[in-house]
Structure formats: structure tokens, C-alpha cells
From Swiss-Prot:
<feature type="domain" description="ELK">
    <location>
        <begin position="237"/>
        <end position="257"/>
    </location>
</feature>
<dbReference type="GO" id="GO:0003677">
    <property type="term" value="F:DNA binding"/>
</dbReference>
<feature type="DNA-binding region" description="Homeobox; TALE-type">
    <location>
        <begin position="258"/>
        <end position="321"/>
    </location>
</feature>
<dbReference type="Pfam" id="PF03789">
    <property type="entry name" value="ELK"/>
</dbReference>
<feature type="region of interest" description="Disordered">
    <location>
        <begin position="75"/>
        <end position="96"/>
    </location>
</feature>
<comment type="similarity">
    <text>Belongs to the TALE/KNOX homeobox family.</text>
</comment>
<dbReference type="Pfam" id="PF03791">
    <property type="entry name" value="KNOX2"/>
</dbReference>
<dbReference type="InterPro" id="IPR005541">
    <property type="entry name" value="KNOX2"/>
</dbReference>
<dbReference type="InterPro" id="IPR017970">
    <property type="entry name" value="Homeobox_CS"/>
</dbReference>
<dbReference type="InterPro" id="IPR050224">
    <property type="entry name" value="TALE_homeobox"/>
</dbReference>
<keyword id="KW-0539">Nucleus</keyword>
<dbReference type="Pfam" id="PF05920">
    <property type="entry name" value="Homeobox_KN"/>
</dbReference>
<dbReference type="Pfam" id="PF03790">
    <property type="entry name" value="KNOX1"/>
</dbReference>
<feature type="compositionally biased region" description="Low complexity">
    <location>
        <begin position="79"/>
        <end position="96"/>
    </location>
</feature>
<dbReference type="InterPro" id="IPR001356">
    <property type="entry name" value="HD"/>
</dbReference>
<protein>
    <recommendedName>
        <fullName>Homeobox protein knotted-1-like LET6</fullName>
    </recommendedName>
</protein>
<dbReference type="InterPro" id="IPR005539">
    <property type="entry name" value="ELK_dom"/>
</dbReference>
Length: 355
């Protein structure tokens, strides 16, 4: 950046505003608008359109409406048109720079502009900008004590400085809001990743994690490690509540499911024991109740499974002989063939009370 003496670093950013860059071709008026010393005055000031320069860290090309809202229409200064345009422009530029730097609001304007540049900038750049701002404040105080500009001497310049300071302040607020939201989002995501990847560093923390799994509470974790909050604590707490509430119902469902599984193919060892008993009693494969209980205890099956197995086995693999058919017929009508109608049809199924 270029400019006058002190504070030249920030002056060129103000020259893009177009302040004092208008030529007046009315030189025949007896009451001229300029004099020999290059002072700048106002003569029916026209309007100019000005926009703030966006900082290099953030740009937005998609919101035309917001950009249009930042446009200000400010009066700019007239200067005298001499015969040498190049010398006149240089003289006018130097005069405007001096007036801006000597204005009481110059430090405020510079601070607002540098605050926009700080948003999203690296730490070293922010430190450099703060150093420039502090240096400018020191020079501004010394300039005020030595008799700088006074508000009211140039109303157009006062309006220019005030409006642009307010515009830069508003621009800084609009830039900082999405930047802060993005930083909060990144911080939350970082905490979640730490919670997923951080392993317990001691047996105490491991035991604490097991207690949390059982109780579904994250209070202990907050006491041990305050650097982050476990995002899964709420899920574990809900899981613990559901288990405590529905554990009995889930247990009954599990038992019912196991019973349904048992209704399928019997285990190999249990089936072999039933086959062995079948072969030993092939002539009359009707186990008594006591024998069924003994088989159920040895095989691990229930009595219903044993009854079903023997029923299916007799239908598929057993046909009674002629003698057995007569016994079965007698058993179907005991009152025709036996004196004791209370007698058991099958001796092997007789209980001690009936013997």
C-alpha cells in the first residue's frame, strides 16, 4: 500500500472508495471550486456508488441481493480541473489521503477494515493486523494532540467516514456469523471423533466403562475426563432402561424360542438313547410314565417330545405281531376279557398302587 507519511499501509484501501475522484469542468464561474493550494470544497455534490472490498478469506458470489444491500450512495468531493490532468490527479490524491488520515474517525475506519480482514485469517496474519491497528492508534493520538482534523470542517468527509465505518462494522458481523457457526460445528465433530477413537488409558477407566454399560450413566465419565462428552452416553442410558423394563419379557421370549427350536430335529445323543431303548423293547415299545421320566432326565428332552418320538417311531417302524394284536384288542375292551376292569392294559405301565 502507498500513501503519505505514517499510516500509509492502510490508506490505499480507502482510495478505492472513489472519494474525491470527480472532475469539474465548470472553470468559467467566478466563484471557482478550487484554489492554488489544492484545497477541496463542495459544489452541488453528485452521488457515487461504493461497495466494501471483500476480505481474501471469505467470498460470496451467489447472493446478489446481499451485495446490493451493501451498496451505499455517498457524496464525493469535487476538485479543480487544471490544464495538466496528471499533476492535478496526483495533487488531489495526496490531498484526499491527508484529509482522510487526519480525520478523527480514521482510526475507527482502519480498525473496522482490519477486523474484516481478521475473519478466517491465520494467527500470524491476525497478529500482524493487530500490530498495524495498535500503531495506527498511537499515531492517531499523537496527530490529535498536534492539531489534527476536527469534525465539522468538511461535512462531506464526515459523512463519508461515518457511513463507511458503519458499513464495515455490519460487513464484519455478516462475515463472522457463518464463520463462528462453522467453527462450532467442527468442534462438535472433533469431540465425536475423539470419543470414538479414544481408548481407556487405565484399568480404572476400563472398569468405569463397564459400569456405564451396565447402568447406562455417563456421570462417572464426566468426573474422570472433562475434556470431552461421550455422545453415546444417552444411547447407553436408554438401552439400560429398556433392558431393566423388558428383561423378563425378553427372557420368556427366549425360552419360547428355545422350545420351538427343540420341536425340530432332536439332538443326536438324545435320539441315540431313545433308539437304544426302542431296540431293547422292540416287542412292546410302550414306555411307562416312570420310564418316560427317566428318558427325559437322561436325554434332556421334555416328556412331550418323548411321547411324540415314540408315536412317530411306532407308526413308521413297528407293526405288532398276531399275539400282540390280540393283546391290543383285549386292551381295547378289558371288561369283555378281564375280571378286573381297573387293571392296566399294559403291565409295563402299571403303577405300584395297581399291582
Amino acid at each position: 500500500m502507498e500513501g503519505g507519511s505514517s499510516g500509509n499501509t492502510s490508506t490505499s484501501c480507502l482510495m478505492m472508495m472513489g472519494y474525491g475522484d470527480h472532475e469539474n469542468n465548470n472553470n468559467n464561474n467566478g466563484n471557482g471550486n478550487g484554489n492554488g493550494n489544492g484545497n477541496v470544497t463542495i459544489c452541488a455534490p453528485p452521488m457515487m456508488m461504493m461497495m466494501p472490498p471483500p476480505p481474501p478469506s471469505l467470498t460470496n458470489n451467489n447472493n446478489a441481493e446481499t451485495s446490493n444491500n451493501n451498496i451505499l450512495f455517498l457524496p464525493f468531493m469535487d476538485n479543480n480541473n487544471n490544464n495538466n490532468p496528471q499533476e492535478d490527479n496526483n495533487s488531489s490524491s495526496s490531498s484526499i489521503k491527508s484529509k482522510i488520515m487526519a480525520h478523527p474517525h480514521y482510526h475507527r475506519l482502519l480498525t473496522a477494515y482490519l477486523n474484516c480482514q481478521k475473519i478466517g485469517a491465520p494467527p500470524e496474519v491476525v497478529a500482524r493486523l493487530e500490530e498495524i491497528c495498535a500503531t495506527s492508534a498511537t499515531m492517531g493520538r499523537s496527530s490529535s494532540s498536534s492539531g489534527g482534523g476536527i469534525i465539522g470542517e468538511d461535512p462531506a468527509l464526515d459523512q463519508f467516514m461515518e457511513a463507511y465505518c458503519e458499513m464495515l462494522t455490519k460487513y464484519e458481523q455478516e462475515l463472522s456469523k457463518p464463520f463462528k457457526e462453522a467453527m462450532v460445528f467442527l468442534s462438535r465433530i472433533e469431540c465425536q471423533f475423539k470419543a470414538l477413537t479414544l481408548a481407556p488409558n487405565s484399568s480404572h477407566e476400563s472398569a468405569l466403562g463397564e459400569a456405564m454399560d451396565r447402568n447406562g450413566s455417563s456421570d462417572e465419565e464426566v468426573d474422570v475426563n472433562n475434556s470431552f462428552i461421550d455422545p453415546q452416553a444417552e444411547d447407553r442410558e436408554l438401552k439400560g432402561q429398556l433392558l431393566r423394563k423388558y428383561s423378563g419379557y425378553l427372557g420368556s421370549l427366549k425360552q419360547e424360542f428355545m422350545k420351538k427350536r427343540k420341536k425340530g430335529k432332536l439332538p443326536k445323543e438324545a435320539r441315540q438313547q431313545l433308539v437304544d431303548w426302542w431296540l431293547r423293547h422292540i416287542k412292546w415299545p410302550y414306555p411307562s410314565e416312570s420310564q418316560k421320566l427317566a428318558l427325559a432326565e437322561s436325554t434332556g428332552l421334555d416328556q412331550k417330545q418323548i411321547n411324540n418320538w415314540f408315536i412317530n417311531q411306532r407308526k413308521r417302524h413297528w407293526k405288532p405281531s398276531e399275539d400282540m394284536q390280540f393283546v391290543v384288542m383285549d386292551a381295547a375292551h378289558p371288561h369283555y376279557y378281564m375280571d378286573n376292569v381297573l387293571a392296566n392294559h399294559f403291565p409295563m405301565d402299571m403303577t405300584p398302587s395297581l399291582l
